[in-house]
Regions:
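Outer membrane beta-barrel strand-and-loop segments of large Gram-negative receptors
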Residues: 456-468, 502-512, 595, 601, ...
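Surface-exposed extracellular loop regions of Gram-negative outer-membrane beta-barrel proteins
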Residues: 396, 440-442, 539, 553, ...
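Periplasmic N-terminal accessory/gating domains of Gram-negative outer-membrane beta-barrel systems
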Residues: 88, 146, 172, 187, ...
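C-terminal beta-signal and adjacent terminal beta-strands/loops
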Residues: 711, 720-731, 749, 754-805
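Flexible loop and strand-edge segments within Gram-negative outer membrane beta-barrel domains
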Residues: 385-462, 496-504, 582-583
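Gram-negative outer-membrane beta-barrel transporters
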Residues: 521, 621-623, 645-729
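Short, acidic Ser/Thr/Gly-rich low-complexity loop/linker segments typical of extracellular
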Residues: 138-152
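Short, acidic, small-residue-rich periplasmic hinge/interaction motif at the N-terminus
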Residues: 20-22, 46, 52, 91, ...
Length: 805
């Protein structure tokens, strides 16, 4: 009996002790603290609680983002548990008392949900590439991303209330509130701002993780030369105002690749260099990659430009008619099935040559340019899209004959066709495409000195199939991977006694994998690799591993430091022997011992952002291998290319400054580039490093625009460049002793422009006019080609009008 009583007593005493501990635990968690309005990191709040209540908080730091900022908006008294819930909003946790002064915080695994969707333009249904999407929770934490080339975005966040904001140049900001408790889809639509772009508005800006993005967008038009005319204001980019034959980072013209809806256009230029590369009225966006290349890109050393065509208005039928100095164009778009199936058709043609019969022979144009775009877009579901597009361009130089007929001396042709499917489901996005693209260059034998009535032709055609995926596993990690296969068929012509032609079939496949890791809110890393197999049927095969690396660190909200590395290889060589491209030019894939060109690009930079502007300082170093050049002593009417082609290596480096600032009525952009591009060849070993043909040590560019009112604006732009190296003297090859020694004088140019914009309800009007080279000393290339219609001293008037209804 006594034993039973003792046992019961001990049991009650144990319960009493447990109750006291539980009571003490509740007391610690429920003790009141006085909190004033303030903002601090999670770690600072933990330290403040420990100091105020003289306790120790125990937790696993790998499970909590201690650098996250938590803000208390008003002064109040609250319990420790209530304060912890504020500090750890979005986390599921429980507290346990370990001792009288030690409280354990245990994090229960946090559920992460995927918010995905497609950003489109209201009314037309156009998907928007590069829209900045942000989610802000109640603690003012922000998650952000950019919509991809299909307008698709994904954000991974825990359950909670969020404010969603979307911004895109030329569109009204979008905002809505969301409560996310499961994987969800949204399809925000953005309203365009009429005529938001000014005459000179090229932005090299960073939104989120994007580096060196050029994404113009306009409700009306990129009429005339808008698409490329101001690209030269970016540091490291030089070229003619029409966008033809531009150079990037000291590289040659053929080191740049243009992708039209993902399809390569092998020769985008036109005989009439006033004629812009593509029809701006049909273009939706443009992105220029130079320096860092995402792993999905390959094939060129200097730059890759993505140009996206519009999809066609899904709500109503719209027509855009444009007439400017080089061409007239018509773009038709509209729904076939509203909200589901849309069309886009664009046609352009030069018109100055139509008046040749009224002019004397020496003043005739004798050449014409024309192109077309056609596209069908079918929204199978809000998250699945099927697209088909076609593009064609023809340039022809002709002369009248005695029979008053036109003899075609030279003709360039481009053709591209593509079928593409894309979509997303939750955290997984996917796309597949098949395309065919071709380029041909045909010249009459008489133009090359042959006494024959026939044509000589060269070209390339390519068939490609590809598929790719991207996946977001959580808020910190994103992966993108894919595979491509292409079958290329080169038609090569030698300028020998018979202008012989040979066919070279080549297979190529590539695999890429890209990882994007956000280590914290200030530090992101992108690491990828592209593996390529290049397999000619008649020559040696090559296999290439191309790593890519990008590190971005933001020490503050207004500053970003970046470091990047890209290895690129190019399986194509091209040397043009005259002022225009001919089929007898040196075009050579990586066969017959001509190894692929390769480059390693290292770059570091700093960007500072301020209200409506930015300042950027950057520097790069780039190595090149297996480059080619024409020997000055060569007589190149020979079937043996190796008798006049030299191979060597090179390097380039640069320090660059870029500034832009916008005010209510003013806009200023300025860039300065100091750069050197050097090459070395065994044939000139005793000369050491020689400047390349694209070595431009100093380059200044600037633009100023003033907005008179909501409809009118003036602009002034200019450039000053060091002269290029001379490789031809009066159309004759220079002596070997002067090889790469002579340089042209300083080039400079000042342009002025005026823009008038007005909307009449559903009708929109844009008028542009101005003068290129009001004062200046333009390059010989510009005088011979671009300024074919000019006033005195190479001053070129331009004008254009667009009407949308």
């Amino acid at each position: 009996m006594n034993r039973t009583a003792i046992f019961i007593g001990l049991f009650l005493l144990t319960l009493s002790g447990y109750g006291q501990n539980a009571s003490h635990q509740r007391t610690v968690a429920e003790e009141r603290v006085h909190v004033t309005p303030s903002s601090a990191t999670v770690l600072q709040w933990f330290q403040w609680i420990e100091k105020k209540k003289h306790i120790t908080l125990s937790y696993n730091s790998s499970q909590i983002d201690l650098s996250r900022t938590c803000r208390i908006k008003r002064e109040q008294d609250m319990s420790v548990s209530e304060l912890l819930e504020k500090i750890l909003e979005g986390y599921q946790f429980r507290t346990t008392l370990l001792s009288d002064d030690k409280l354990l915080i245990q994090i229960i695994r946090q559920e992460i949900y995927c918010l995905s969707g497609t950003v489109t333009e209201s009314g037309s249904g156009e998907r928007l590439y590069g829209a900045a999407v942000t989610l802000e929770n109640q603690s003012a934490e922000i998650k952000y991303t950019l919509s991809d080339e299909n307008g698709i975005f994904r954000l991974l966040v825990p359950e909670g209330h969020y404010k969603m904001k979307i911004s895109y140049m030329g569109y009204q900001p979008y905002e809505r509130s969301l409560y996310i408790r499961r994987d969800s889809k949204v399809f925000p639509q953005m309203s365009p701002l009429l005529f938001e772009l000014e005459e000179v508005t090229v932005k090299s800006h960073k939104q989120g993780d994007e580096l060196d993005a050029l994404t113009p967008a306009s409700l009306l038009s990129f009429s005339g030369n808008d698409l490329f005319s101001q690209i030269w204001i970016l540091p490291g980019v030089t070229g003619t105002p029409s966008g033809d034959n531009f150079q990037v980072n000291g590289g040659s013209n053929d080191e740049n690749l243009l992708l039209l809806d993902g399809v390569p256009v092998y020769h985008p230029g036109h005989l009439n260099t006033l004629f812009p590369v593509f029809n701006g009225d049909a273009v939706k966006s443009m992105v220029l990659h130079k320096g860092y290349f995402p792993a999905r890109f390959e094939g060129r050393l200097s730059s890759i430009t993505e140009i996206k065509l519009k999809e066609g208005n899904k709500q109503e039928h719209v027509q855009t008619v444009s007439l400017d100095m080089p061409a007239a164009s018509v773009v038709l778009e509209g729904p076939i099935i509203k909200q589901k199936l849309s069309y886009l058709i664009g046609v352009r043609r030069s018109w100055l040559d139509l008046f040749d019969e009224l002019l004397s022979e020496e003043n005739r144009m004798n050449h014409s340019s024309a192109d077309y775009n056609a596209k069908l877009t079918y929204a199978i579901t809000p998250s699945q899209t099927l697209e088909a597009f076609a593009y064609g361009a023809k340039d022809e130089y002709h002369v009248p004959t005695e029979e008053k007929e036109r003899l075609s001396l030279l003709r360039w042709n481009n053709e591209s066709y593509q079928l593409r499917y894309s979509g997303f489901k939750g955290r997984l996005g996917y796309a597949a495409s098949v395309y065919y693209t071709s380029y041909s260059n045909r010249v009459h034998a008489a133009a090359l000195g042959y006494d024959e009535d026939r044509y000589i032709q060269s070209g390339i055609n390519s068939t490609n199939v590809s598929t790719e995926f991207n996946y977001s596993s959580d808020a910190m990690y994103n992966a993108r991977w894919g595979v491509k296969y292409s079958y290329d068929r080169y038609e090569l012509t030698n300028d020998d006694n018979e202008a012989s032609v040979r066919l070279e079939p080549i297979s190529q496949f590539s695999l890429f994998y890209d990882n994007h890791l956000r280590i914290n809110d200030n530090l992101t890393v992108q690491v990828g690799v592209n593996f390529i197999g290049y397999i000619p049927r008649k020559s040696r095969s090559y296999y290439s591993i191309q790593p890519r690396f990008l590190l971005q660190y933001s020490p503050s909200k207004k500053d970003m430091l970046y470091l990047c590395f890209s290895k690129m290889e190019q399986f194509y060589h091209y040397l043009r022997f005259g002022s225009v491209a001919l089929p007898t030019d040196f075009r050579m894939p990586s066969i017959d011992g001509y190894k692929p060109r390769s480059a390693d690009h290292y770059e570091a930079g700093w960007k500072h952002y301020f209200d409506n502007g930015q300042l950027e300082l950057s520097a790069y170093y780039k190595t090149r291998r297996n480059i080619i050049a024409l020997h000055p002593d060569a007589f190149y009417s020979d079937a043996e290319w190796k008798t006049f082609i030299m191979t060597g290596s090179g390097y380039s480096y640069s320090a660059r400054l870029y500034f832009q600032k916008y005010w209510k009525h003013w806009m200023v952009q300025f860039s300065y580039t100091y750069a050197r591009s050097m090459e070395r060849f065994n044939e000139f070993r005793d000369r050491g490093d020689l400047p390349s043909l694209f070595d431009i040590p100093h380059q200044w560019t600037g633009a100023v625009a003033y907005k008179l009112n909501t409809r009118s604006s003036f602009s002034l732009g200019g450039l000053v460049n060091s002269g290029k190296i001379i490789d031809m003297n009066d159309w004759e090859a220079i002596e070997a002793s002067d090889f790469r020694k002579l340089r042209r004088p300083l080039n400079y140019r000042i342009d002025v422009g005026y823009t008038y914009k007005r909307d009449f309800g559903n009708r929109l009007l844009l008028f542009r006019c101005g003068l290129y080279n009001v004062v200046g000393n333009p390059t010989e290339e510009e005088l011979l080609n671009f300024y074919s219609v000019s006033w005195g001293n190479g001053c070129l008037p331009y004008g254009g009008i667009s009407f949308r209804f």
